[in-house]
Swiss-Prot record:
GO terms for cellular component: cytoplasm; nucleus; ribonucleoprotein complex; ribosome. SUPFAM superfamilies: RL5-like. This is Large ribosomal subunit protein uL5. Its main location: nucleus. It holds the Pfam family Ribosomal_L5. It comes from the Eukaryota.
């Protein structure tokens, strides 16, 4: 009885809050501007350049150098782009793609699989998709006036996100192989 009433509540429905698409080029310059054009073509909005947090000498990256481009999409456009991205992955994800907070992410190798025409001057770029799931009513935690907390039962869990993916997108989730823990022996 309680489970049925929880399922019928429209506030309990899981929705896509936002979709973040990221292309990390690893260097600034011409390749980064071409990647931003690809992302602008895909999302139909202007992307934002991301900067490196640390200097990594082996990769030739300096701190605060522009190395990536990302775009945050919400609403119907986010659901359309998510559908295109999942088609490339054939609606198959692994269990470790899902986080404990109910979000999930995956990557694709070539942007031309999403339906964008190949341009030899642009090249081919891979990208990461990050999907943030939530429920209606979570605005109370983020608003400026009369801010309050969202209850623990209203948060999206990993299991709920996986069930949502299987139900809404008819997706398949593979169980990831468990990593063996290394036993460290003390030297005497």
């Amino acid at each position: 009885m309680v489970a049925e009433s929880k399922a019928a509540n429209p506030m309990r429905e899981i929705v896509v809050k936002k979709l973040c698409i990221n292309i990390c080029v690893g260097e600034s310059g011409d390749r980064l501007t071409r990647a931003s054009k690809v992302l602008e073509q895909l999302c139909e909005q202007t992307p934002v350049l991301s900067r490196a947090r640390l200097t990594v000498r082996t990769f030739g990256i300096r701190r605060n150098e522009k190395i990536a481009v990302h775009c945050t999409v919400r609403g119907k456009k986010a659901e359309e782009l998510l559908e295109k991205g999942l088609k490339v992955k054939e609606f198959e994800l692994k269990s470790y793609n899902f986080s404990d907070t109910g979000s999930f992410g995956f990557g694709i190798d070539e942007h031309i699989d999403l339906g964008i025409k190949y341009d030899p001057s642009t090249g081919i770029y891979g990208m990461d998709f990050y999907v943030v799931l939530g429920r209606r009513g979570e605005r109370v935690a983020h608003r400026k006036r009369k801010c309050s907390r969202v209850g623990h039962s209203h948060h999206v869990t990993k299991e709920e996100a996986m069930k949502w993916f299987e139900k809404v997108h008819d997706g398949i989730i593979f169980q990831a192989k468990k990593k063996k823990k290394m036993i460290r022996r003390r030297r005497r």
